[in-house]
Amino acid sequence: SCEGVRGYVYVDLKALLSGGFYSIPDLYVDVLNVCIGSGNQGIYPFNWRLYPTDQDVTSFWSSYYTTMMHINYAIRHMDAAYEYLTPDEQKKVDVYKGEMYFFRAYVMHRAALLFCEDYDPDKAADQLGLPYPKEWEPEAKLARGTLAKLYENVEADLVEAEKTVTAQGTPTDQIYLTKDAITAFRAELALHLHQYTEASQYAQSLYGTYPLVTTAEGLERMWREDTSTENILQLEVLRTTMTTVNSFGSYLNSSWKPNLGEYFYAPTYIPEQHIVKLFKDADFRTDIFLVKNANVTISGNKGVGVLIGKFRGNKNFQTNTTTLVYRNRPKMFRISQMYLVDAEAQYRLDPAKGLDPLNQLRTARGLAALAMSDVEKDVTLLDGTKISGLFNAIQEAVSYTH
């Protein structure tokens, strides 16, 4: 069925937005440190030793292009079924095809962030791109082409998507693609392509619809219950389907000690010290994003440390009150990301204005506004996006206030 092949692609996207697809890039850019008991998981990205035969590199490549194959198969299947559908069914399938065009653009952009040079408008016609399959041809051997051509294809697919995906979106944890989600992606894409005025405009157009969280309770619900007015697109996951997303257990690997009434941890990865220092005791994000004074045992060595707590998982997926599941509904787009896009874009246009959206985000999180002179070097916490932000000035200066 058309709904079936559509659903399969959504499952692929959930996998691409969880687990190692976040942690491996963060290892590469010194957000995380590898522990001695890791069994060498992630050690090559951590040491900046990237080889085409490395399992992390090959699994990323394979996952992105398997998803592309499923997207193109879905489009082909929908085209073949179209004449046999009722008019009402055809209207639905038109939307489904629009979703597939969007996901094709999104997946190729995500792959380009990892496998291509940073986009340079003056050099893109000569920079290597990636194969951009548009047909279901599993055995095809496509040329990489240029980065300029890749983003021409991305734009063409977005235009196709916008023809049929017209549902506006609401701040109610949308699980399927909306017009607002496309706008959010256009904001991120415009920033990457150095189209700063457009990036700012796209981002700002969503502010009025998706209110920022302003309390610790609201932020905790975002990560422990997967519900928030900030979610522009959050893919559906249930307790019965939570294995469709990858685990973040490597940040904690917790075990509950009932006789002591507390957790003990054996993490694979821990945050770098410069990340820990970004959080102050008065910051209401601290107890949500970090586990402080954690009892840690690594390869027989016991101590107390600070761990990543952001991905404890949705507590409604737990079968009891103490066994953490380390899985969440993937948040493809959130309004807080739009404030960061806007901040970066405005900074590029006029450094004096770059702090305006950043400070709106900071004050919503209960933090003091910053002056340009006291902006701290900061990063986005564990969203796997820092690797693509290495070339962005203000992303080197914003805290993961979202």
Residue ranges and their predicted role:
Residues 4, 200-335, 367-376, 384-391:
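Hydrophobic-face positions in mid-chain alpha helices that act as interaction patches
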